[in-house]
Amino acid sequence: MSLSEARFHDLVDATQQALEDLFDESGLDLDMENSAGVLTIKFDNGSQLIFSRQEPLRQLWLADRSGGFHFDYDEESGKWVCEKSEELLGEMLERIVWERAGEKLDFDEI
């Protein structure tokens, strides 16, 4: 069963807020902007992560210099799962943030 439009937006909003909170509390040198449902995280080395919602597909998209990734929400696990690799969003973010910022952050709740 696919997500309703309202449920999808609630999930993306909650995920983006959780990401903002986590990055705020991390102590990393970065800038964040959330505009029109697009969350951009800019690291001090110039790399960035861009999270956007794709309403027609009910997907959360992540753009990084290593590529674009599309995540579907799995109601059973309560996690965003990459449609291609089946990697959890939190796992991917832990790896990407380590590669971009050299810091280990815990994204288990994402």
From Swiss-Prot:
Single biological process term from Gene Ontology: iron-sulfur cluster assembly
GO annotation, cellular component aspect: cytosol
Pfam families noted in UniProt: Frataxin_Cyay
Entry keywords, A to Z: Iron, Metal-binding
InterPro entries, alphabetized: CyaY, Frataxin/CyaY, Frataxin/CyaY_sf, Frataxin_CS
Taxonomy, superkingdom: Bacteria
Name of this protein: Iron-sulfur cluster assembly protein CyaY
Protein's organism: Pseudomonas putida (strain W619)
